[in-house]
């Protein structure tokens, strides 16, 4: 029996809803997307604060449990940029990658990490828990691979000897920042229902 009969995911992305639902069964009976008419601006200054803002707002507006995530790429040589602005670093994935590679053209330190924070909010908007996942890697000088999205073609994962874009969705999920954060949320639900 699910711990939560239904919860809302603070996203309009049906693919993300399906991914989260797959990770969170059997603890959440049904996970639904935020209605298209509801937009939540990411106005906070950190991944944690943005995830909490989105989860709390969705919970209060919908009157039910809500889950939200915020994630992005933090490049060491760029002092953590693009960070919380990862999705707004350009108009398209190609433009974001082009800008990143241009800014790193003469940079030898290519270390970077993807960060994901997930927040679970009660129907009154209070935060029940946040979880975090990180995946360390390096920024390549040119894209590799056809899969994934965003910065995946230039994000090299040394432990896998491939970019995210060269991994299958299942392989990526096993090592990614979002996969780690979702696994920690699963562990939280397991403590509620031993």
Swiss-Prot record:
Its EC number is 3.6.1.66. It holds the Pfam family Ham1p_like. Keywords: Hydrolase, Magnesium, Metal-binding, Nucleotide metabolism, Nucleotide-binding. Substrate binds at residues 11-16, 71, 149-152, 172, 177-178. It comes from the Bacteria. Its cofactor is Mg(2+). GO terms for cellular component: cytosol. Transmembrane segments: none annotated. It catalyses: XTP + H2O = XMP + diphosphate + H(+); dITP + H2O = dIMP + diphosphate + H(+); ITP + H2O = IMP + diphosphate + H(+). Gene3D superfamilies: 3.90.950.10. The keyword Metal-binding applies. The keyword Lyase does not apply. Binds 1 Mg(2+) ion per subunit. One of its GO terms (molecular function) is dITP diphosphatase activity. Mg(2+) binds at residue 70. One of its GO terms (biological process) is nucleotide metabolic process. The active site is at 70 (proton acceptor). Pyrophosphatase that catalyzes the hydrolysis of nucleoside triphosphates to their monophosphate derivatives, with a high preference for the non-canonical purine nucleotides XTP (xanthosine triphosphate), dITP (deoxyinosine triphosphate) and ITP. Seems to function as a house-cleaning enzyme that removes non-canonical purine nucleotides from the nucleotide pool, thus preventing their incorporation into DNA/RNA and avoiding chromosomal lesions. Belongs to the HAM1 NTPase family. Homodimer. This is dITP/XTP pyrophosphatase. The lineage of its organism: Bacteria, Bacillati, Cyanobacteriota, Cyanophyceae, Acaryochloridales.
């Amino acid at each position: 029996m699910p711990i939560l009969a239904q919860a809302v995911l603070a996203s309009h992305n049906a693919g993300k809803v399906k991914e989260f639902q797959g990770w969170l069964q059997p603890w959440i009976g049904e996970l639904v997307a935020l209605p298209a008419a509801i937009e939540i601006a990411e106005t906070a200054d950190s991944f944690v604060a943005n995830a909490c803002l989105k989860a709390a707002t969705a919970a209060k507006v919908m009157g039910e449990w809500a889950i939200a995530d915020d994630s992005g790429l933090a490049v060491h040589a760029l002092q953590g940029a693009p960070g919380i602005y990862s999705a707004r670093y350009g108009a398209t994935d190609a433009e974001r990658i082009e800008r990143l590679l241009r800014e790193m053209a003469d940079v030898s330190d290519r270390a970077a990490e993807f960060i994901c924070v997930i927040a679970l909010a009660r129907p009154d908007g209070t935060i029940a828990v946040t979880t975090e996942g990180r995946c360390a890697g390096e920024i390549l000088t040119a894209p590799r691979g056809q899969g994934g999205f965003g910065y995946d073609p230039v994000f090299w994962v040394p432990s896998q000897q491939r970019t995210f874009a060269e991994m299958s969705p299942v392989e990526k999920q096993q090592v990614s920042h979002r996969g780690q954060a979702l696994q920690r949320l699963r562990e939280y639900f397991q403590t509620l229902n031993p």
